[in-house]
């Protein structure tokens, strides 16, 4: 008789054990010769060495399945322990699975292009309107790379200038000041990583979320780095960000040209970067549009209404300019 401790890593034990420990009870029933005690993320096993080896091998398979799909069903447990390959999930173009087990997939042609560009290039620019899924897809790609151990960390950043607010005038300490700007990034991560695991990742700096200014002076290795709302970077800021790229690192830059909040006297760093970097090998540019919007159907209509208004306003300015020149 031997005793062994098996530590579950990179998964939520609550999902692995099942509701009311149903999964663990099933595993115990399938291994009647072993004494199995599970607490937290540790499984303690006592029994025959040969039986123990088979148990450990199958727990590893179940753990891998749980990490990939964020779920563990009873039929999967039975299939794996009985030596059958579990029936394949309908993965198709699945990037990752949400914490509820729902597949996160590209929901439009241009989102799929973003996924394909990320696979082939080390730097991708994704430009599109609000709700087109560019940031959510980018974060899903980063989470997949982390789960597959292709990288060691995820770094998410945004320039904190939306709505023209100055951080110094906002209440609270630095974390209180910057968190509202970064909340959309937290929201996406919470969809894809169990709360306890996400907290652990952030405490260990495996996942880092910070304003763009905090990137200065760093070299970012073994990471997927995402710069969101890049239209609000200055030319100096985006150059600083892009040159942080280290070994085994991929970058995704997202932005919406219709939501530039910089003072009118400043040029958007994203606009300039698209012009300067066009044609550089290893950099891909993906444009999303209103057809890619996956939010409420009203969002598409709102985007169209603003596009029409801005087009008419531009035409009116040109007309007035021409009239002035003729006088």
Say what each PLM segment does.
Residues 42, 97-109, 116-227, 231-327:
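Conserved helicase motor core of SF1/SF2 NTP-dependent helicases
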Residues 76-107, 119:
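Proteins enriched for Cys/Gly/acidic motifs involved in redox and nucleic-acid/cofactor modification
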Residues 23, 55-58, 238:
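Hydrophobic side chains in well-ordered alpha-helices
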Residues 33-36, 285-286:
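A short linear hydrophobic-aromatic micro-motif
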Residues 11-31:
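Short amphipathic alpha-helix segments
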Residues 11, 21, 49-50, 232, ...:
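Short, surface-exposed acidic/glycine-rich loop or hinge patches that mediate macromolecular interfaces
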Residues 1-14:
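N-terminal presequence-like segments and adjacent domain-start helices
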Residues 29, 36-91:
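Interdomain "pre-motor" coupling segment immediately N-terminal to P-loop NTPase/helicase cores
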